Amino acid sequence: MRIKICGLTQIDQAQAIAKVGVTDLGFICVQKSPRYVTPTQLATLTEALPAHIGKVGVFANQTLSEMLAIISQGNLTTAQLHGDESPELCQQLRQQRPDLEIIKALRIRDRRSLEWAKQYETVVDALLLDAYDPQQLGGTGHQINWDDLRQFNPAVPWFLAGGLNPDNIAVALGQLHPDGIDLSSGVEQSPGIKDLSKVQALMTALQAIASQPLHA
């Protein structure tokens, strides 16, 4: 299972978190976000990370040309589209950067929101389900109703996000079986500043889950 920590802004924290067993680190490329990093900061952050760590840029309602420039400057391996991007834009991005992993985030209000997934399954590499918030695009701490996701079985891998933290991850993974998890505010002191003790608590909880007979 992929483990993604999102909203990094500090080099020392990114390097420390990269060592504890996560697979991907996410960086917010949306200017209105309190976790925003500039393209120059992004390049500095990604250059400091090991090659095996996925470097995910999070975008929202940005132009194709803007995304391509940031992806190139930031040496990103993955683009996560967290706004209202169309399947057509996803396809255009894939045509321009066939080497790039594309994740489409869907902001889930209720079970009906899951129907949007079908539109993207043929044009992205993975989906990410986050809780809907009218004011923020992510990192809200709001939780999806997990009961709505029990039958979710898309044709591509998917990440569970939305209010996950070290205290509820075992319950979440006891009910659902995503291909990856994504945490931001659940392992923070404040927006963009991670709490390394919470990240370690998350990894400890995941190790305990993995050691259970059902997951062995």
Swiss-Prot record:
Molecular-function annotations in GO: phosphoribosylanthranilate isomerase activity
One Pfam family cited in the UniProt record for this chain: PRAI
Keyword Nucleus: no
InterPro entries xref list: Aldolase_TIM, PRAI_dom, RibuloseP-bd_barrel, TrpF_fam
Domain of life of the source: Bacteria
GO BP, sorted A to Z: L-tryptophan biosynthetic process
Gene3D superfamilies noted in UniProt: Aldolase class I
EC nos: 5.3.1.24
Ranges in a coiled coil: none
Pathway membership: Amino-acid biosynthesis; L-tryptophan biosynthesis; L-tryptophan from chorismate: step 3/5
Chemical reaction(s) catalysed: N-(5-phospho-beta-D-ribosyl)anthranilate = 1-(2-carboxyphenylamino)-1-deoxy-D-ribulose 5-phosphate
UniProt family annotation: Belongs to the TrpF family.
Listed PANTHER family: N-(5'-PHOSPHORIBOSYL)ANTHRANILATE ISOMERASE (PTHR42894:SF1)
Protein name, entry field: N-(5'-phosphoribosyl)anthranilate isomerase
Organism of provenance: Picosynechococcus sp. (strain ATCC 27264 / PCC 7002 / PR-6) (Agmenellum quadruplicatum)
